[in-house]
Structures are given as structure tokens and as C-alpha cells.
A protein has these predicted regions:
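Short glycine/proline- and charge-enriched loop/turn segments
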Residues: 16-23, 156-161, 275
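Short, flexible helix/strand-to-coil boundary loops that buttress conserved ligand/catalytic motifs
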Residues: 13-14, 97-98, 189, 228, ...
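Conserved FAD-binding catalytic core of PHBH/FMO-like flavoproteins
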Residues: 6-9, 26-28, 37-193, 206
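Conserved mid-domain beta->alpha element of the FAD-binding
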Residues: 85-86, 111, 141, 194-283
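Short, cationic motifs built from Arg/Lys/His that form the positively charged side of catalytic pockets
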Residues: 32, 93-96, 218, 264-268, ...
Length: 323
């Protein structure tokens, strides 16, 4: 991480072999389309998953006598099963039906773009996830697909009232929020030919994810800001944990759902709340910025790893020991 004002290197975390040795897994980044494609391929290969597109679930009903759940789509068709997993995103229909809690719109806006290798500056072609922390803003870049592309993500505190959602962005807006940063970081916002704009939000963590035979997973359960870079990871952890819970309970759905909730609520709530704090650290201004820089100065890799043990030390073998 660098200071976006003066290029000062605030801290560096080794994510190569030392990271693998400590946590038992590599540190990796992946293109959104590639992870979606990989998950889709894996689901198809099981031969047990059916896909129905252009289908929007609008309501859920449950029958306690038969212990079944019915999902009703936009055409009135009824889909009946033993359980329902609402992995339907931050604006989840399932969560809205059972919890109906409002989003916490942050006022922070994220712009994202992918830049081809040939168009990316040579002096920023680092094989690392790199962050430039500025006052009320920050920039991130990292290689994708073996360095053939680079992801560029910039965040700033909006001057206007925001509505949670995604739209097309404008280069002029981005440039207006990054006037005071150093030239090396500023060149990042001049690269993309087009941007996508996210007005971000999260929700307060909730302690109940299970509603009879219905549950929620991923952003539906714990919508979070991007500051911990763990949204997709937490969704996949949820899925692994639910699968393990079904395995150890011999597919007893009631027991499995209870075990799933017990082992995921605290960890994911910590991600949501930590994300808020990381956003404050990244966007520190004035004296707070100087304090942040001094706190991480000279910190050893072991101290960084110790601080991250709770996050990166998770694996399938301890996923049912988190409650």
C-alpha cells in the first residue's frame, strides 16, 4: 500500500510462498467472469443441477406439515423443494420477505474497469494487488489472466446523494475526485476507455439466517463494502460450510441449516464491520493519515500475518468450528 499523495510505501504484505506456508493456501485474484465460469462448469459436471434462466422468484411459501418450501416466480409457477437457499444478492427477495431491513448507503462510489496489458503503464505492471490510499479516496490495481489484463478500481466519497446500484460511469466524474494525488497513481484513472459505476451500500449484520426451511447465502446474508475484498470469498465459504453441514448431519436439513448459521454469522459480520473500518483507514486525511502511515511503518511480515490469521486461516477443515 502506498500513500497516494507522496508515493510513500505505507506497508507491504508478501503474498507468495511465505503466505502459502503460513496459511496453507495461495493468495490469488481472478476475473469475475472466470470465477463465474468455473463455478458454472463445476455445477454442470455434477449432473445434478438444473438451470432455469429468465426466472425471478418473487415469493416464498412454507408448509410445516410436509416440511417443504415453495418458491413462486414472476409467472406464478411454483417450485417445490425440501429447502430453499436464497443466494439472490444484496437486494435479496428472500431476505426482504423474512427480514426487510434497509440498506446502509455509504455515500462511497466505486468505479471499475479492465485495461489490456498493452495499454497499462510499465512502471505499474506489478505482480501484486496494489493500493494507493488518498484522502477520502483510494485506487487499486492488479493483474488478471496471467498479466494479460489489469483490473483498475477507484473509490471516492461522493458529493451527492447516492442510490444503491450500478450505472455507467464518466471519466469526468472520476477525474474531479482525484485532483490532489501523485502523478504515478493519477495515470490509473486516465487509462480506461469505459467505466462501470457502483454506488455502494451494506447492511447491518443479522443473527438469524434461517427461516424454517429457507436460508440466505452470500450477499443476501451479509452485503458488505469492497474494502476487505471478500465478498465473493465469503459467498463461496458459505456454500462450502453449508455443504459440510449437510454432510455431517447426513442431510438433515433442519440440523444442517442450524449448523450453517451458527458457523457463519460471526465471521461474516466481522467482515462487514471490518470493511467499514478499513474504508476509514484507506481514506484517512490530515493528521489521521499521518497516524495511519506511522502505525504500519516497519511492521514485520509476521505481524501482518498474525493480524490476518482470522481471515486467511479459514479452510474447509475448520469451517464447522467457527461458531
Amino acid at each position: 500500500m502506498h500513500d497516494a499523495i507522496d508515493e510513500y510505501q505505507i506497508g507491504k504484505i508478501e503474498t507468495g510462498e511465505a503466505f502459502r506456508q503460513r496459511f496453507g493456501n495461495p493468495y490469488a485474484v481472478i476475473h469475475r467472469a472466470d470465477i463465474h465460469g468455473s463455478l458454472l462448469e463445476g455445477a454442470v459436471e455434477t449432473g445434478r443441477v438444473e438451470f432455469f434462466t429468465n426466472t425471478r422468484i418473487e415469493k416464498v411459501e412454507q408448509d410445516d406439515a410436509t416440511k417443504t418450501v415453495t418458491a413462486i416466480d414472476q409467472n406464478g409457477k411454483r417450485w417445490v423443494g425440501q429447502a430453499l437457499i436464497g443466494a439472490d444478492g444484496g437486494k435479496s427477495v428472500v431476505r426482504a420477505q423474512y427480514v426487510n431491513d434497509p440498506p446502509r448507503v455509504t455515500g462511497h462510489v466505486v468505479y471499475r474497469a479492465v485495461v489490456e496489458k498493452a495499454d497499462f503503464p510499465d512502471d505499474l505492471k506489478w505482480n501484486a494487488a496494489s493500493l494507493w490510499a488518498g484522502p477520502k479516496c483510494h485506487l487499486v490495481h492488479y493483474p488478471l489472466r496471467g498479466g494479460e489484463q489489469y483490473n483498475v478500481v477507484v473509490t471516492f466519497h461522493s458529493r451527492q446523494q447516492e442510490q444503491w446500484g450500478v450505472t455507467d460511469g464518466s471519466k469526468e466524474e472520476v477525474e474531479s475526485y482525484f485532483q490532489g494525488i501523485c502523478p504515478k497513481a493519477r495515470q490509473l484513472i486516465e487509462l480506461p476507455k469505459s467505466w462501470r459505476r457502483w454506488a455502494t451500500a451494506d447492511k447491518e449484520p443479522i443473527g438469524t439466517w434461517v427461516f424454517g426451511r429457507a436460508t440466505i447465502l452470500g450477499d443476501a446474508a451479509h452485503p458488505t463494502t469492497q474494502y476487505m475484498a471478500q465478498g465473493a470469498c465469503m459467498a463461496m465459504e458459505d456454500a462450502v460450510t453449508l455443504g459440510e453441514a449437510l454432510r455431517v448431519t447426513n442431510k438433515d436439513w433442519d440440523a444442517a441449516l442450524a449448523l450453517y448459521q451458527k458457523n457463519r454469522v460471526t465471521r461474516t459480520a466481522r467482515i462487514v464491520l471490518s470493511g467499514r473500518e478499513m474504508g476509514r483507514l484507506y481514506h484517512a486525511a490530515g493528521v489521521e493519515r499521518l497516524v495511519r502511515n506511522s502505525l504500519w511503518k516497519g511492521r514485520s511480515q509476521e505481524r501482518f500475518y498474525d493480524a490476518m490469521e482470522w481471515l486467511y486461516g479459514w479452510n474447509v477443515h475448520n469451517c464447522l468450528q467457527q461458531g
